[in-house]
UniProtKB/Swiss-Prot annotation:
Present with 5130 molecules/cell in log phase SD medium. Residues 1-43 are annotated as: Disordered. This is Negative cofactor 2 complex subunit alpha. Coiled coil: none annotated. Residues 1-11 have a biased composition (Polar residues). GO terms for biological process: cellular response to heat; negative regulation of RNA polymerase II transcription preinitiation complex assembly; negative regulation of transcription by RNA polymerase II; positive regulation of transcription by RNA polymerase II; RNA polymerase II preinitiation complex assembly; transcription by RNA polymerase II. The gene is BUR6. One of its GO terms (molecular function) is RNA polymerase II general transcription initiation factor activity. Component of the NC2 complex which represses RNA polymerase II transcription through binding to SPT15/TBP and thereby inhibiting the assembly of the preinitiation complex. The NC2 complex may also mediate transcriptional activation from TATA-driven promoters through association with SPT15/TBP. Keywords: Activator, Nucleus, Phosphoprotein, Repressor, Transcription, Transcription regulation. Disulfide bonds: none annotated. The keyword Transcription applies. Pfam families: CBFD_NFYB_HMF (PF00808). GO terms for cellular component: negative cofactor 2 complex; nucleus.
Length: 142
């Protein structure tokens, strides 16, 4: 019993897309890492992040859903890191859109245009404010 290795709760860092391991053929494993230039830029942005989402708060938010029972220790950490990657990508794409319009600021309108123009963010479209003159689909009540 004295030869047991202590169990640590610290997880290894999650590798961003630009650090995906290569298979024997020299291509990225899986379908990630298709555009290495954009991934390197996103990795640079992500490397500068000094703050992280607190896993305890992420866990509390996850457990507000009735369908979620027990949550392992790694799950909130991974969810927080995924959220950081997502936000970094949204800010990067919005910054490109702002530069394309000749401005240095990311406004709500630029965020909205980014979400509407990029298919990666199509799941956010239902949460956008609806323009005047457009009708928002009514939710069905059960």
């Amino acid at each position: 019993m004295a030869d047991q290795v202590p169990v640590t709760t610290q997880l290894p860092p999650i590798k961003p897309e630009h650090e995906v391991p290569l298979d024997a053929g020299g291509s990225p494993v899986g379908n990630m890492g298709t555009n290495s230039n954009n991934n390197n830029e996103l990795g640079d942005v992500f490397d500068r992040i000094k703050t992280h989402f607190p896993p305890a708060k992420v866990k509390k938010i996850m457990q507000t859903d009735e369908d979620i029972g027990k949550v392992s220790q790694a799950t909130p950490v991974i969810a927080g890191r995924s959220l950081e990657f997502f936000i970094a990508l949204l800010v990067k794409k919005s910054g490109e859109m702002a530069r394309g319009q000749g401005t240095k600021r990311i406004t709500a309108e630029i965020l909205k245009k980014t979400i509407l123009n990029d298919e990666k963010f199509d799941f956010l479209r239902e949460g956008l404010c609806v323009e005047e003159g457009q009708t928002q689909p009514e939710e069905e009540s059960a």
